[in-house]
Regions:
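Non-catalytic pre-domain segments flanking phosphatase-related domains
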Residues: 2-29, 81, 86-97, 279-288
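Active-site neighborhood of HAD-like aspartate-dependent phosphohydrolases
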Residues: 18-64
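Helix-loop "lid/cap" segments that line or gate small-molecule binding pockets
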Residues: 47-53, 76-91, 188
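Short, surface-exposed acidic
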Residues: 54-67, 87-106, 165-168, 196-206
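Short, acidic loop-to-helix structural element flanking the phosphoryl-transfer center
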Residues: 107-146, 150-158, 182
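Substrate-recognition "cap/lid" segment bordering the active-site pocket of phosphatases
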Residues: 145, 150-209, 215-229, 233
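Acidic, Mg2+-coordinating phosphoryl-transfer loop and its flanking beta/alpha structural elements
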Residues: 210-266
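Short acidic-hydrophobic, aromatic-tinged amphipathic segments that line or gate anion-handling sites
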Residues: 265-273
Length: 288
């Protein structure tokens, strides 16, 4: 990881390959609920969008239940689905109207404009990893990237401006079909393997893990495995931040069981625990 200082003395981090051999493994990340806490931003915008049209404010548990179905990774579509389930089908807004209301709540300004002018819920997001986390991944010999269903301006904001990453490997909304379609995951994996001069997807390629926080993320990895069955894949999962509170312990247990039933092969306590999980997995592979 190359570190450089901008004029404002802010450290930036740029992914690069400094290994003489291919990386030991690839670690791909979802962003929402894994790299940043969106409980007060994307999820709040979803709730506020539903409230705007129905007068009803969905709870975090209701959103979790919807996400647990593995079908509603796109929050605009999730907003519409919650409105349908409230019995407002005959009065449903258009998809474009949903997007406009949601975007105003989340960004509070032009998504493609200067982030300094955004006044929306995006300003509430806290980071779940420090910038140095990516340096640690590189030191461990892991190549990394991001496969997210969030809008590109939102992804770039958290990765580049908040975390200081330079040109991070990213598949965002619009770059590939929505998850759980595995095309984005497969595309980024192939890109990273080529960039690091590693063998292509298959039995000779480095192992690949994907860390997400929803059933949809787990399904995405499982479908990638179906597409390329001779590649070593690992579905890793972490419960979203709002379930880490002491009072949410029971709900968190239920949520993690749901992730396991969907096919997650390991549940992590935190995103940072991915390094230990990867080392354990590579150790298992060495014993094969």
């Amino acid at each position: 990881l190359v570190r450089s200082r901008q004029k404002d003395n802010h450290l930036t981090y740029q992914s690069c390959c400094y290994w003489s051999l291919s990386p030991r493994a690839l670690v791909l990340f979802d962003i929402d609920g894994v790299i940043r806490d969106v409980g007060g931003s994307y999820r709040r915008a979803l709730s506020e969008t539903v409230y705007h049209y129905s007068g009803y404010l969905p709870t975090a548990a209701e959103i979790d239940a919807l996400k647990g179905e593995g079908l509603w990774n796109n929050d605009w579509e999730a907003s519409l689905e919650l409105l349908r389930r409230r019995g407002t089908s005959s009065l449903l807004p258009t998809f474009d109207d949903i997007v406009a209301v949601f975007s105003e709540a989340y960004f509070g300004g032009d998504p493609h404009g200067d982030p300094a002018n955004w006044k929306g819920f995006i300003g509430n997001e806290t980071l779940l990893v420090p910038p140095e986390f990516f340096n640690t991944l590189n030191d461990a010999g892991f190549a990394w990237g991001f496969v997210s269903g969030a809008e590109p301006p939102s992804c770039r904001y958290v990765l580049e401006q908040r975390l200081g990453l330079v040109d991070p490997p990213l598949i965002a909304m619009g770059d590939a079909p929505d998850k759980p379609n595995p095309q984005g995951l497969l595309r980024l994996t192939a890109l990273l393997l080529g960039r690091h001069q590693a063998p292509g997807l298959g039995p000779l390629a480095p192992p690949v893990a994907y860390l997400g926080d929803t059933v949809t993320d787990v399904f995405t990895l499982q479908r990638a495995r179906q597409a390329v069955p001779d590649q070593r894949w690992r579905a890793l999962a972490v419960a979203p931040p709002h379930l880490h509170a002491v009072e949410a312990q029971s709900a968190r247990g239920d949520y993690e069981e749901q992730l396991l039933r969907a096919g997650a092969e390991a549940i992590l306590a935190t995103t940072a625990a991915v390094i230990e999980a990867m080392e354990a997995w590579l150790g298992e592979i060495d014993q094969e």
